[in-house]
């Protein structure tokens, strides 16, 4: 994982500097490319010695764009560069590091909230307000379902974790009873 982060960093930095005037749009297409590049079957296809760089580019660009929303020229150029350099598998990490650079410039941090159950918009807004106050910064929140939590939430903000789930409380009780 650390190796992938090391590989991705120069690409994310270069993309951030090159697209400095249009970070929001760039974030959209780089996330779209990362989602496509995260597919294990696509990576296996791209690693095949029988497949050319142009074929890989055509497949990835074709999946990432459609008639209503074609990839911008900058996205196509970036994708071609990544594929030619054999770094397609690093694209999700490149997107993650690009988002971190973009958020840092805007005074924001990514946060992932794991919940046992789906949350409505009001509950998410309430949680966002509490987490922003707790961590002292603006958060871009993404929600993921994790039924193993039983109840409550687990919030991951950068390298900090706030776990108020039933599962965590049961683990704490178990440790207290064992000790």
Swiss-Prot record:
Topology in the lipid bilayer: Peripheral membrane protein
Entry GO MF terms? proton-transporting ATP synthase activity, rotational mechanism
An annotated GO cellular component of this protein is: proton-transporting ATP synthase complex
In terms of InterPro entries, this protein maps to: ATP_synth_OSCP/delta_N_sf (IPR026015), ATPase_OSCP/dsu (IPR000711)
For this UniProt record, the keywords arranged alphabetically read as follows: ATP synthesis, Cell inner membrane, Cell membrane, CF(1), Hydrogen ion transport, Ion transport, Membrane, Transport
Q: Subcellular localization, per the record? A: Cell inner membrane
Q: What does this protein do?
A: F(1)F(0) ATP synthase produces ATP from ADP in the presence of a proton or sodium gradient. F-type ATPases consist of two structural domains, F(1) containing the extramembraneous catalytic core and F(0) containing the membrane proton channel, linked together by a central stalk and a peripheral stalk. During catalysis, ATP synthesis in the catalytic domain of F(1) is coupled via a rotary mechanism of the central stalk subunits to proton translocation.
Q: List, alphabetically, the NCBIfam families matched.
A: ATP_synt_delta, PRK05758.2-2
User: What protein family is recorded?
Assistant: Belongs to the ATPase delta chain family.
* Record's subunit section: F-type ATPases have 2 components, F(1) - the catalytic core - and F(0) - the membrane proton channel. F(1) has five subunits: alpha(3), beta(3), gamma(1), delta(1), epsilon(1). F(0) has three main subunits: a(1), b(2) and c(10-14). The alpha and beta chains form an alternating ring which encloses part of the gamma chain. F(1) is attached to F(0) by a central stalk formed by the gamma and epsilon chains, while a peripheral stalk is formed by the delta and b chains.
Entry protein name? ATP synthase subunit delta
User: Origin organism of this chain?
Assistant: Polaromonas naphthalenivorans (strain CJ2)
Gene designation: atpH
